[in-house]
Amino acid sequence: MPWRKDRFCWDALLLAGGRSLRMGTDKASLVVEGVPLLQLQVRRLREAGASTVWISHASGPAPSPSRHEDIRWIADGAPGLGPWPGMRQALQASDADALLVLAVDLPAMTPCFLRRVANPASHGVGRIPETPHGLEPLCALYPLPAAAVASEAIAMDGEPSPRRIAIRGIREGWMQVMAVDEADAPALVNWNRPGDWSPVAPGTGA
């Protein structure tokens, strides 16, 4: 959706193309709160206000849910290079003002937290959470010009990481840091191994 003076519009990209080697099974298919984690994260992004939800998945057939009017699929055509190829495709294809990127394996994420991330100080500026452990580039808002910046970086020294792009944005003023306090930090804890999984999202109770 185009920029309007009275509204800031953002799309979301859900990163679900990882190989999940340590987990041993596709993280996006783990059942949490009675539904696959992929579906739960799509629901949260919609509740937070995403105009369109994109999903970056591994090459091959799109995972379930395979069809929905509000979902657009991006096949990872460059496996092994991390999340940036999918992010670049979505940034180039989106006509919103910014793209909120979210890793699928953050089970305690909430629509409220996502709305905070998607609330930049001004148009053309992105936002990235920072905890005591560092920046969180896989739950961050990237302004659309980030695609052009990344293309410059690729031409100079190869495929960039989201962290490097975010750090450059902070340095140049088109990304702002959102401090995360101790109460909200669990929203950014991800699942990596089988012992991390629970059918109930962390912090929601039994």
Outline where the language-model segments fall.
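Nucleotide and nucleotide-moiety/phosphate-recognizing core
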Residues: 2-160, 167-187, 195, 201
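Terminal amphipathic alpha-helical/low-complexity segments used for targeting or macromolecular assembly
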Residues: 203-206
